[in-house]
Amino acid sequence: MKILIPTAKELNTQVAQIEPESLSEKTKLIIRALSQYSVADLAQLYQIRPEKAKEEYQRIQKLQNETALTYPALYLFDGLMYRNIKRKNLTKEEEQYVQNHLLITSSLYGVIPALAPIAPHRLDFMTKLKVEKQSLKKLWTETYGQAVADQEILLSLLSSEFEEVFPKEVRDKMIRFKFMEEKDGKRKIHSTISKKARGQFLSYLIENHITKLSDIKQSSFSGFKFQENLSQEREFVFVKKVDG
């Protein structure tokens, strides 16, 4: 069983650094392509302010020169979902679970173990960057598929932006999750609920070393409970009742 989570724009470089690992050929190609961009080019590419573009330019040059500092991906990313994942004071068993089951889908590094070393960067699949005349999604599709080809159980906590990178035969195997709040008999779903709940759900999986779909259906965490009547074979729905 593998669990797939996306990257995040928010980063925390106040965490402990770790030694870098050798980069894949695709990652090197992307870095080489980005290294040709000026600060002004990057501001346009990412639709960001000049000062942010300058920061990104410096990051890219460090990646190109192999002087970039690297951090465990799970700790470097610090978006809302990540802030709701249990990341501190993991037991040996919990850390082993993370190493065995959790994968992060990156537009720069590919599908990587959650604790793999990565450098700070801004790139995502919405970036209109061409590498060898291919979009980032096209560039990575085959590699993404190979990364999880042998997995029978594939849990996706990804947005469509990341799921679409995988080949159809892999997407068809994915178990997806919907997290909803119910208030006064009405159920709703929105981005903030989903991002927080994904992190809380992942924490539950880590703490309880969950590896079976039957155990996921018994899950209860942070007020969310599995709803058999709302779920489908490959879409599991969890609902949290909140006071009116």
Curated annotation (Swiss-Prot):
Pfam families: H2O2_YaaD. GO terms for biological process: response to hydroperoxide. InterPro entries: YaaA (IPR005583). GO terms for cellular component: cytosol. It comes from the Bacteria. HAMAP family: UPF0246. Belongs to the UPF0246 family. This is UPF0246 protein SGO_1307. It comes from Streptococcus gordonii (strain Challis / ATCC 35105 / BCRC 15272 / CH1 / DL1 / V288).
